[in-house]
């Protein structure tokens, strides 16, 4: 059994289970009794002290089904353009989560999707989502991690629609992992991000992709967002709803150079 060990436990989040629990309790606070069942969510992937609260605001509100597809960007440059994790399980301080092998085989029928471990070895964007899922899941679940590089819009859109058709047969959640604007003043980040948030609220992936390029908006997961939103549309989603927006300055006190974080639910 090939188990991916945590690459960023101890840096992005505590590697000790009890310390992780304490931080989660601090960040997440009150958990609503009523849960939402979205087609997809968008959550950030920075260190928990920076973006954990925004991620929590989404995760604590949703029902987590038996299958979770994780879509994230490739920060390392390793692996294939559309990299579907080829191992058996992922580990975090909360334990081991199995990979959904049957779902993987269906996804690998897409021409540009490849089985791969290299893109996932050191990639943090999907790993940091797992402890949130483990904390709030009310039953066992399996995952399918997919890392996507900056592919052309038509490829991302087409893959998203393919993924959506596959997931029509499943009880599944799509998790899109992305931070928003990087290393700009907080006011500039908000103005730029509002352009992309507006597109995502309307599920307009073409506008999302090309305005990110046109205005040089450094949303690292714009391509995973195109894939995930197109999938959600196939599954019946009609809108995106902003749950939370924050930036690193809220933690550091320095608003002159921030990374911005967004939490969204797609229904």
Curated annotation (Swiss-Prot):
UniProt record similarity statement: Belongs to the MEMO1 family.
InterPro entries this protein is in? MEMO1_fam (IPR002737)
Name under which the protein is recorded: MEMO1 family protein aq_890
Gene3D superfamilies associated with the record: LigB-like (3.40.830.10)
Superkingdom, taxonomy of origin: Bacteria
Source species: Aquifex aeolicus (strain VF5)
């Amino acid at each position: 059994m090939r188990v991916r060990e945590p690459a960023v436990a101890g840096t992005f989040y505590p590697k000790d289970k009890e310390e992780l629990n304490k931080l989660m309790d601090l960040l997440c606070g009150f958990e609503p009794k009523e849960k939402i069942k979205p087609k997809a969510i968008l959550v950030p992937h920075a260190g928990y002290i920076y973006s954990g609260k925004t991620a929590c605001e989404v995760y604590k509100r949703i029902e987590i089904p038996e299958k979770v597809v994780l879509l994230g960007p490739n920060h390392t440059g390793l692996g294939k353009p559309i990299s579907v994790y080829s191992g058996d399980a992922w580990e975090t301080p909360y334990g081991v989560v199995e990979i959904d092998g049957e779902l993987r085989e269906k996804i690998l029928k897409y021409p540009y999707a490849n089985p791969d471990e290299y893109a996932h070895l050191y990639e943090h964007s999907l790993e940091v989502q797992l402890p949130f899922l483990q904390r709030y899941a009310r039953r066992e679940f399996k995952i399918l991690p997919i890392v996507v590089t900056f592919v052309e819009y038509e490829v991302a859109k087409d893959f998203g629609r393919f993924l959506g058709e596959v997931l029509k047969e499943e009880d599944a959640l799509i998790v899109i992992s992305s931070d928003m604007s990087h290393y700009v003043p907080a006011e500039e980040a908000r103005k730029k991000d509002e352009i992309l948030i507006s597109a995502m609220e309307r599920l307009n992936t073409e506008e999302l992709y090309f305005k990110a390029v046109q205005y040089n908006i450094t949303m690292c997961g714009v391509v995973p967002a195109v894939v995930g939103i197109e999938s959600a549309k196939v599954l019946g989603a009609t809108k995106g709803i902003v749950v939370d927006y924050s930036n690193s300055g809220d933690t550091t006190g320095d608003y002159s150079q921030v990374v911005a974080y967004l939490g969204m639910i797609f229904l």
